[in-house]
Regions:
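Flexible "stalk/tail and boundary" regions
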Residues: 1-21, 25, 35-92, 96, ...
Length: 156
């Protein structure tokens, strides 16, 4: 199979894979090298859905931010949705060891104490407590979920 340079670049710009790491006593977390290459040094960590944290590269955060800005301020759900993601959002930087310092409120929100899973999710990274990851990502009902995705237009 022949791949084009554009396709190779696109693959490099996606976050994929599952990595197990630990948060140290100071709240620092090592970011896998594959993720660091794409994050560079401009990224945002915020509350995510399902009790995890979302990590957006700067450019993806800007796209998300524009979508949030487009929501009507007169809609209460839109305000709550925006508040959920933006109020706790924190710009982060990698230190020389490739770690980030996760603010305590975000660690508490996601229940991050020691063992964590970093999951690449195409345009973002999710940071989960290992326990929540295991609870939320069982494959027991994947056939049902696949059927629902088909209803949304995603067919495998």
């Amino acid at each position: 199979v022949k791949t084009t340079a554009t396709a190779r670049k696109r693959v490099c710009r996606m976050f994929m894979g599952e990595y197990n790491h630990t948060v140290d006593a100071k709240g620092r977390l090592i970011i896998p090298s594959r993720f660091r290459e794409e994050l560079k040094n401009e990224f945002i960590v915020t509350k995510g859905l399902d009790g995890c944290l979302f990590v957006f590269p700067g450019n993806e955060w800007q796209i998300f931010e524009e979508k949030l800005k487009a929501l009507p301020l007169t809609n209460k759900n839109a305000r709550q949705f925006s508040r959920f993601f933006v109020a706790g959002a924190t710009p982060c930087e990698l230190d020389r060891q490739g770690r980030i310092l996760l603010p305590l409120p975000l660690r508490e929100f996601a229940g991050l104490e020691k063992d964590v899973v970093l999951a690449g999710m195409l345009n973002r990274i999710e940071i989960w407590s290992k326990t929540k990851w295991m609870e939320n990502n069982s494959c027991d009902n994947m056939d049902d979920i696949a059927e629902q995705m088909s209803d949304l237009g995603l067919c495998i």
